[in-house]
Amino acid sequence: MNPLATLEQGLADIDAQGLRRCRRVADTACGAHMTVDGRAIIGFASNDYLGLAAHPRLVEAFAEGARRYGSGSGGSHLLGGHSRAHATLEDELAAFSGGFSDAPRALYFSTGYMANLAALTALAGRGATIFSDALNHASLIDGARLSRANVQIYPHGDADALDARLRACDAPTKLIVSDTVFSMDGDVAPLARLVALAETHGAWLVVDDAHGFGVLGPQGRGALAAHGLRSPNLVYVGTLGKAAGVAGAFVVAHETVIEWLVQRARSYIFTTAAPPSVACAVSASLAVIASDEGDARRAHLGALIKRTRAILRATHWQPVDSHTAVQPLVIGSNEATLAAMAALDAQGLWVPAIRPPTVPAGTSRLRISLSAAHSFDDLARLEAALVTPIGAAA
């Protein structure tokens, strides 16, 4: 069999299992109401939790940044691409999210995937042991693999099982790695226990707050701030393309940790820096997130979450007990989940079907993602539409 035929057979196998993923084309800015593939829809697919992706203040900051700095950075951060906009943003991120450390410093990355790879591959290596939650994001899984450390997977959210594994480990370097808000279930890690275990066992605790930053905690400062947690063992990763409404990610930790990443993190060193205009837009986003407007958006989002939980509990399917903007409705089979997604789409509602390997086999689901840009009328549309596709998919 030739190489192309091998791929064609692989794609046929994906189709047979109902697992092919397809992109949709947005013709308008990200928001609750969009034009997608030429059709008007209400979107419940994005991670734009605060509805900032098309905020005029961010758009203008992006445009002004491009006028000042041009369209690209021109190089890596260590070879000419580190602008004043990047430096200013890192100072702002350290001040905003670094309350857990006595000497916080931040490092900006082009993507969350790169930030997670940087933290794990630079802090761990051969001879180290990484303890990773069973439901961690793919970027944390890949970072652990690429680090060449020994990797132990502990049961999801099970701090007691993690404690037992840490007690049995004599590796000189240990890392506990966990999402804060888990992206497919919407539940929150036992962060206070994880911090205590990290300090008890002399381990780093790397937390990925992709779905908590901007939403949780006072002024949206994130999951650690929401729980009032502080520790020199913490390494905090935040994402800027979700609630912040722009792009990129960052790591905040003690200044010594960040300097180590600058010197050793390959996904920071060997890539072109993001355009400075992106950093300008993120700075504007931080100002909105921390403002009274940000508080109002978080309050509205909280009310939407409460209403959605009530809607999903009224269905005969299995809602996951989530108190966050990620509201999954577990259906089970790939085929039934795809049918439900298609029926919702026919009624102008974009609710994506999540299937393996993103979630375990037999737990395919609709992932309803809420935004402060949604209205209660949008939820009423969703509630009315759920009855038909869910019944048809049964």
Curated annotation (Swiss-Prot):
Organism, as annotated: Burkholderia mallei (strain ATCC 23344)
Keyword Ligase: no
Top-level taxon of origin: Bacteria
Cofactor(s) the protein requires to work: pyridoxal 5'-phosphate
PANTHER family referenced in this protein's UniProt entry, alphabetically: 8-AMINO-7-OXONONANOATE SYNTHASE (PTHR13693:SF100), CLASS II AMINOTRANSFERASE/8-AMINO-7-OXONONANOATE SYNTHASE (PTHR13693)
Name of the protein: 8-amino-7-oxononanoate synthase
Record bears the keyword Isomerase: no
Known pathway: Cofactor biosynthesis; biotin biosynthesis
Gene that specifies this protein: bioF
N6-(pyridoxal phosphate)lysine found at: 242
Biological processes per GO annotation: biotin biosynthetic process
Amino acids binding substrate: 21, 137, 358
InterPro entries for this protein: Aminotransferase_I/II_large, AON_synthase_class-II, AONS_Archaea/Proteobacteria, AONS_Proteobacteria, PyrdxlP-dep_Trfase, PyrdxlP-dep_Trfase_major, PyrdxlP-dep_Trfase_small
Catalysed conversion reaction: 6-carboxyhexanoyl-[ACP] + L-alanine + H(+) = (8S)-8-amino-7-oxononanoate + holo-[ACP] + CO2
Function of the molecule: Catalyzes the decarboxylative condensation of pimeloyl-[acyl-carrier protein] and L-alanine to produce 8-amino-7-oxononanoate (AON), [acyl-carrier protein], and carbon dioxide.
Binding of pyridoxal 5'-phosphate, residues: 112-113, 183, 211, 239
